[in-house]
Amino acid sequence: MLQAFDEGNSHAWGNIEYDEDPWVFNASRPYFVTAGLQNRHLSLWASHGRYWDAERGWKWQRPNLFCTTEDLFTQTIVVPYLIPMLENAGAIVFTPRERDWQQQEIVVDNDDRRSIAYQEFVNGKKWKNCDSLGFANLQASYQDGENPFQMGTVRQAKATRRKKNSLVSYQPNFQKEGKYAVYVSYQTLPKSVPDAKYIVYHKGQATEFTVNQRMGGGTWVYLGTFEFDKGCNEFNRVVCTNHASRRGVVTTDAVRFGGGMGNIERGGFVSGLPRCLEGARYYAQWAGAPYSVYGGRKGKNDYADDINTRSMMTNWLGGGSVYMPAIDGKRVPIELSLALHSDAGYNPDGQSTWGALAICTTDFNDGMLNSGISRFASKDFAKALRDNLVEDMTNTFGSFGKRYLWDRNYSETRLPEVPSA
């Protein structure tokens, strides 16, 4: 990844490279990215978000300014612009805050015995429960430390290369027509396949994905955002099949449509806001992360926990990959992380631009990242990011300030085990 901005850089990944199947691949894309960011896995997040304060209840982390707050403003940069730009260049982008602004949420799961939205079809290999725990949405809200991905079961079937295959259909009843993010879940087993097949039917159109189930099991895995019709029919659903190119097993658990409302209870109350407006701490719990990822302060300081959760989620997913080989995790090959802040700042004249600041941390863990490469890779990345941004903004809009390149002790650049800024 870093070679993209500095060929031959001695601080970059060198011969460390992930060259196997990506976590998620859109097989229906009308073009194939052959260079750029193809199959690069990145972690990117917008700053802050609503959090629980023990004395003042649910509140924003940053003050109101220009009729908004940084907790809201940075989402309007990252979600509609930055993430799609990177995805269109071929990247697989993880973000530790909910990315979907849709307030509706529908979860279809095999553990909901009353639902007709979940159906299994056997055409050869049979579906059965696997030994691992899975997702179940058994309650309207969750207390601190409760993990919905430890409350249910997971289904599995032997994979087949034949056209004759079994499938599971997830067909929700949409109360409103609109755009909904689609998240799937599964479990990673020793014999999991690298290309489990999913088909998203949206307003009658079919978009096909392959998901590498050898990584990232036991959490929500984002496929894309699609337009769905109101109601319940086979033209608006998700199908998981046991078709794969290699021998092994396909697992399938719940499928989630829409970002939804916050459902993590703190101090006896949920936030009452869409999940996308909350901090990463609460999304991490809904996404099945262990308490050590988001609850380092044991429920006593959500503000500090939220700051650390963004990086800890990245490490939890990336642990065990070629880029973070020495820590346990989900083996997703995340190789770069970026936190975007607006700093809620302005010039004293209230008119001119304040400019760009980039931050990195090199003085930590003897100056090394988990893979053994130098933390100066983060400094190279931060400098290139700031310099290119200033150049682009100046060329497009006129003068744009170049502030500082800070090498300081900040959580979001200290904790990630990959180059970060």
Ranges and model annotations:
Residues 1-48, 52-61, 245, 252-273:
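Non-catalytic propeptide/linker segments at domain boundaries
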Residues 54-58, 193-195, 348-352:
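Short, solvent-exposed loop/turn and secondary-structure capping segments
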Residues 55-73, 356-369:
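A solvent-exposed, charged loop/short amphipathic helix patch at secondary-structure junctions
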Residues 65-84, 277-278:
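Short catalytic helix/loop segments, enriched in acidic residues and glycine
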Residues 80, 89-164, 170-173, 187-191, ...:
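Active-site-proximal helix/loop segments of hydrolytic enzymes
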Residues 178-184:
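A short tyrosine-centered beta-strand micro-motif
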